[in-house]
Amino acid sequence: MYLDQYKIKGTLNLDGHKCFHDINTYPAFQQDLEKFKDHLVSLVDNKESATFFKFGDGDYYFLTQQHVGSAAPGARALSKSFNDIDMSKFTSGANLCDYYTCEIYPENRDKFKQVIDKKINYPAEYGYGLVGNKWFFEKFKGRIGLIGASEKLYLTEELMKYDEYKEYLGLDSFVDYIHYPQKWAADDIDMVEEFVGEQLAKSTADIFLLGIGHSKCASLHTFKKYKNAIYMDVGGGMDMIAGCINTRRPYAGDWINFRIPDYDYSQIDYLKYNFANEKML
């Protein structure tokens, strides 16, 4: 069992990484969690505009052009070869966000330092945990939008038609659904920026939760051009909201994956989904 030091109230963490068993991994975890929450509330209440980039090992492999996992051409972000796109847009863009989060895994923090010349502001686990315990929904009710893969946003919109699901989230609605390509977004990042920018220009949310894959390296920092808001990259937290999270992911252990009867899930690009904690609506 992970140490109390790394618990986030209202969640269960089944991630077995040894860093959660070492008090020296991140001694200020609880104190910085409160600072993070206060920081977000202040930013949103003051109508600030800022981007939070969540770094994962896949972003490292993408930025260093390695054929590993989701970063590999043909897997998710890119259908072309790395040589067929302008990688400088991604390597430079990844350094242009306002704040950075990264898991407390020491190996991921080492990878971050190799490709991004910025400091890590907060653990990425905060984003997962505050989706998992619904803090985001409680704190920013009526002000929160989503940016993510169209297929998962369509699914989330359907889930939000059910009172049981709205009660589970403690939320009546998301004020905006900003669609983003589920696959191959890095093939033509300028087209993606235009597509997303047109939607953002018409949006009303004060804070967006988002999960948009490795192409965010080039696109995330541009969002502020189209809409003043807080852009909070929660990565796999978007899979929680869509009811398809692998419960072994950090702080997703007791999340209920609500499922819709007769819904066509064949178009959903699952991220190692383990079909656990499912409940049919």
What are these regions, as identified by a protein language model?
Residues 1-170:
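Electropositive, gly/pro-rich neighborhoods at or near active sites that engage anionic ligands
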Residues 35-42, 84-88, 188-200, 215-217:
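A short, acidic, amphipathic alpha-helical segment used as a generic capping/interface helix at domain edges
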Residues 101-102, 146, 176-179, 233:
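Structural signal for conserved beta-strand scaffold positions within catalytic alpha/beta enzyme cores
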Residues 151-152, 214-216:
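Alpha-helix capping/helix-boundary segments
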Residues 170-206:
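A mid-sequence, solvent-exposed acidic-amphipathic segment
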Residues 207-211:
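Short catalytic-loop micro-motif centered on adjacent basic/acidic residues
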